[in-house]
Amino acid sequence: VLGMACLTVQAAEPLTSLDKPEGRLDIIAWPGYIERGQTDKQYDWVSQFEKDTGCQVNVKTAATSDEMVSLMAKGGYDLVTASGDASLRLIMGKRVQPINTALIAGWGSLDPRIAKGAWFNVGGKVYGTPYQWGPNLLMYNTRVFPTPPDSWRVVFVKQDLPDGKTNQGRVQAYDGPIYIADAALFVKATQPQLGIEDPYQLTETQYNAVLKVLRDQQPLIHRYWHDATVQMNDFKNEGVAASSSWPYQANGLKAEGQPVATVFPKEGVTGWADTTMLHSEAKHPVCAYKWMNWSLTPKVQGDVAAWFGSLPVVPEGCKASALLGDKGCETNGYEQFNRIHFWKTPVAEGGKYVPYSRWTQDYIAIMGGR
């Protein structure tokens, strides 16, 4: 048993040098995060990497953080593009290993606002390489709202919208339990007496007030969304007027000439800062390090941001991609960093706060109308 314990500790020691690449790389990623030109041939940051390193890239897409965590538990993958609501679970569950940042040439070019993020720096160790970040915005139909809405109220409180029709059955909410934090920001602004400071650290009393807002919202919901493509279709063809969304959907719909726009509501927004994390039992660690390095090159950073509607973790990425253009970072919200409450896994901290396991249980019940 002792021998085994020593082995596991050693296995998690980061590499000190890179040998010959293993020829293969298996990545779990959000849809649209790793493109090889199959959707649109201009968007390809895989082919060149494969040519340069000989590492064949295989991508398994996942639509939610919970799905990523369960895929990582099954194993057989090298990397995952984990959001902050998954990263701590992966670290605590020992599914990912710390990395040696000295082996990542581009490390020094990281945005200092991201480099020290609490969602991947734990106990003096660095678990992974930042990839992209972005906000969860309020997307709305401009025909329904000639003047942009300035509050999340339009999706949380039953009301008539500016076109004179009710919002019932015309709004959406994200179907991940982490959406409880979006409701917490609304409660923080509208019920200040509850004293919510951090939407991911809710006491029992605060949490119950937030759940009430979500239960009241449930009859208004057209669909709880997680598939970006389905949400885009709902705005186009199903009469959805407002919802939380990613810049990805808004950019796609605008490109098709649809009447949509996005806004940062006055209550603030949640957001995600995603980290490429290395599986604790990765079979292709050299290819994984090569990918983490490649992922920080300014052009790759800019191209991903252009495609996904996200933001580069390397500031130079804002000026390195013809696809993103000079104004792309501004459009996607680069200056809004301080207004974003980035996703992180809610933890109990010795019983002070309601932990994520309860968020999951309760949100599933609420979505089911219970």
Predicted features along the sequence, with ranges:
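Extracytoplasmic ligand-binding site segments that recognize negatively charged/polar headgroups
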Residues: 34-41, 81-230
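A ligand-binding cleft/hinge motif common to bilobed small-molecule-binding domains
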Residues: 86-89, 244-259
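Paired acidic/hydrophobic, glycine-rich loop segments that form the ligand-binding mouth/hinge
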Residues: 78-82, 224, 241-246, 261-262
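Mature extracytoplasmic/periplasmic domains
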Residues: 279-343
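Conserved C-terminal helix/tail region of periplasmic/extracytoplasmic solute-binding proteins
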Residues: 339-370
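Early extracytoplasmic/lumenal segment of secretory-pathway proteins
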Residues: 12-90
